[in-house]
Each structure stands twice: as structure tokens, then as C-alpha cells.
A protein has these predicted regions:
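N-terminal secretory signal peptides and thylakoid transit peptides that target proteins
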Residues: 1-14
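A cross-kingdom marker for long, charged
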Residues: 27-56, 60-109, 113-372
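Intrinsic structural disorder/low-complexity segments
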Residues: 8, 21-22, 236
């Protein structure tokens, strides 16, 4: 286990480490329930149908070993800036795209599915807006032409790791501009972290869909929570009223970049404020299908809800202001950052089970033991 103390005293850190080891052992040792297995099998069946819809060349391009480094090398940048692996959504046939959406629906809740689908559709809007801007303002484009032309709903990529067959661990990845969605199945259980979601534009400002917002509640619920704090609580949680970080800190390859907890412990919130915190956590964790979400929420609770810390940087009275917040605990990292007006980034991670690593370790231990 990682030995960082998160700013705790040595005694408290030892106690927390013991509690975490116990919670992880309980989580890893709990057999998958029938609901877990049904959901995992539904995802497996959808993945199989997607693979069968591809031609031989695309099936080869989409398939990687489970241990391939590419499984953890997604990006949220435009494809022209960071090439992707797997198959391009725009290059596969209509039936394959439909099967891909079946797989995405099998892996997420209704809220998670619609967020991801709308992020992809919104990239079409962004591409159109940026190309129009470039046409009328060629001396100072906001983004390079190659990056702009690589935007759009067709420029997302999907990759499969391992084989989606019963009894074997496997995973799949959907990534592109403002999206990094990872799903891992091991032992009949599904892990849906890390999950990066971004939006640009956050809100449609013109046209027939003016007012439509992709990721509205992430910012609103965060603002509800910080606005509910009493002055003495705010002095601990609000680390600065100046503009916050313009991006998340725990993006791809940076899970361990946070060396300590910061801000206000959840145990110092009153019951109505704790309800707001739980609603905010649900807004992220429940993007996953219900079984994966419930298992993650249960792990967060067993690690100690009081261990969650809430911190805020930036103005606290304007949803359109450049603010940043974080929720951080032993089994959860949530970050929200306003990059620029009408442009946000979010990420959710499980420090102990990102990419299902804890469950995969247990699976291989059990497999090695049964082979003796």
C-alpha cells in the first residue's frame, strides 16, 4: 500500500492504513453478488456483440492484451495532439456504432450514458465553432487547424483489453476529446474508474439548443455545498478566493500527484451539509452502472465517510466564475476545474482500485493458487 500520510500525524496514518487494509481485504474478498454478475455478463455480452460486428481488420486493431500499457494511456486532448489506440468510431459501420452504444449503455447508468454521448456530440459543435472562427480570424486561431479538424463525434476511439469471456478479466476504453472512460471486469465485478469528463461548450449559447448544458450538476452541486458552509467551516475548506486551478491535477498518469488531504473533513459538516456532499459524490460515482456504483460507494463508506475532505479554490458565488474543487478520501478523488468560461474538466478516481487493479491482483492470486 502507498505509504503517503496525507498530512496526518504518524499515529493517525498508521491507524488509517490499518483500516484501509481491512476495508480492501473485505472488498476484494467479498464474492460478486448475483446482481454484480448479471451486470458484468450484460457488459460482456454487449462487448462480444460489438466485436462480432467488426470486420477482421478492425477486430484486430481494437484488441490488446489486458496487461498492455495502452489501457492506462488515454487522453482528453484532441486526437491530433495525442494519437489514440484501437479503432476510430468514425471508421466503423453503422451497425458497429450501434453495438458500441449498446456496450456503453451496458457499462453506465442513464445519467452516465447521456453525459458521455452528449460530450461526443458537443465536440461537433466545438469543431464547427472553431472552424468558423479560424475562417474569419486566420492570423490568431484559438487552436491549430489540425487539432480543430480532429475534433468531432467521429474522432473518438475504442479499445478492448483481454477477451470478454466468462471467467476471464477484461477491460475496455473509450477516449477522445474531453473523454476518458475506462471499464474493467474482474471476478464478476465492474470498476468504472478513472473517468474523465469535460465539456466545451458547457452550455449551448446560440441556436435551437440554446441553454442546453452537458455537465450542469457537477458545478451547481459543488456551489451548493460551498455556499452552505458556515464562516468557520469556509475558513478551512476555501483555500483561496482567487481563480482556482485551471485543470484537474490527477489526469492520466498522475493518480498519485496528490500527496495529502486538504480542506474540510466530512465529519465537520452538519447533517444537511453531509447530504449535499453525498449528492455531489453521487453525481460522479453514479455515472457507472448501478452495481459498480453501489460497490464503489460501499467501499467509500467502509473506508470512512469522515475521511472525505472537501476543498475549494476561487469565487464562491458565481457558477460562471473560474473555480476549482476537490473531494479526496482513501477510496475517492473527485476534481472539478473551470478551464475558461464555458469550458470545464472533471475526473473521478479510486486511489485503491483504479482500472480494477486491486481486483485484478486478487484474480491472479486466486488463479495461481487454483493452478497449483
Amino acid at each position: 500500500m502507498n505509504r503517503r500520510h496525507f498530512g496526518l500525524s504518524a499515529t493517525a496514518a498508521v491507524l488509517l492504513a490499518q483500516q484501509l487494509r481491512q476495508a480492501l481485504a473485505q472488498d476484494a474478498g467479498r464474492p460478486a453478488s448475483s446482481v454484480d454478475r448479471d451486470s458484468a455478463w450484460r457488459m460482456r455480452d454487449a462487448a462480444t456483440a460489438f466485436l462480432e460486428s467488426l470486420d477482421a481488420a478492425a477486430r484486430k486493431a481494437v484488441s490488446f492484451p489486458l496487461e498492455a500499457d495502452q489501457r492506462t494511456s488515454w487522453s482528453n486532448l484532441p486526437v491530433a495532439l495525442v494519437p489514440r489506440v484501437g479503432v476510430n468510431v468514425g471508421a466503423i459501420g453503422l451497425q458497429s456504432r450501434r453495438r458500441l452504444h449498446d456496450l456503453l449503455r451496458a457499462s453506465t447508468s442513464s445519467q452516465g450514458y447521456h453525459k458521455i454521448a452528449e460530450i461526443m456530440r458537443h465536440d461537433d459543435l466545438l469543431r464547427t465553432e472553431e472552424l468558423e472562427y479560424l475562417q474569419h480570424n486566420p492570423p490568431r486561431p484559438r487552436a491549430g487547424r489540425n487539432a480543430i479538424e480532429s475534433m468531432g463525434s467521429a474522432n473518438y476511439w475504442v479499445a478492448m483489453f483481454g477477451e470478454p469471456v466468462r471467467g476471464k478479466p477484461w477491460a475496455w476504453l473509450l477516449t477522445g476529446h474531453h473523454l476518458g472512460a475506462t471499464f474493467t471486469c474482474a471476478g464478476g465485478r465492474v470498476a468504472a474508474a478513472p473517468l474523465f469528463l469535460g465539456a466545451q461548450p458547457l452550455e449551448d449559447l446560440t441556436g435551437p439548443y440554446a441553454g442546453f448544458t452537458v455537465l450542469s450538476h457537477e458545478g451547481l452541486r459543488g456551489l451548493d455545498l460551498v455556499s452552505s458552509l458556515h464562516p468557520e467551516q469556509a475558513r478551512v475548506a476555501v483555500l483561496s478566493t482567487e481563480p482556482g486551478f485551471s485543470d484537474v491535477l490527477t489526469g492520466v498518469g498522475r493518480r498519485d500527484s496528490l500527496s495529502r488531504f486538504e480542506g474540510l473533513p466530512a465529519g465537520d459538516l452538519d447533517p444537511p451539509q453531509q447530504r449535499l456532499l453525498h449528492a455531489l459524490v453521487d453525481e460522479y460515482v453514479r455515472n457507472a452502472d448501478f452495481d459498480a456504483a453501489e460497490r464503489h460507494l460501499d467501499a467509500i463508506q467502509r473506508a470512512g465517510l469522515d475521511q472525505l475532505h472537501f476543498s475549494w479554490r476561487g469565487p464562491t458565488n458565481d457558477i460562471r466564475s473560474p473555480f476549482y474543487y476537490r473531494i479526496h478520501g482513501p477510496r475517492l478523488i473527485i476534481e472539478f476545474a473551470v478551464q475558461e468560461p464555458n469550458h470545464i474538466h472533471t475526473i473521478m478516481r479510486d486511489p485503491q482500485n483504479d482500472y480494477g487493479m486491486d481486483w485484478l491482483g486478487l484474480h491472479y492470486e486466486e488463479h495461481a493458487w487454483s493452478a497449483r
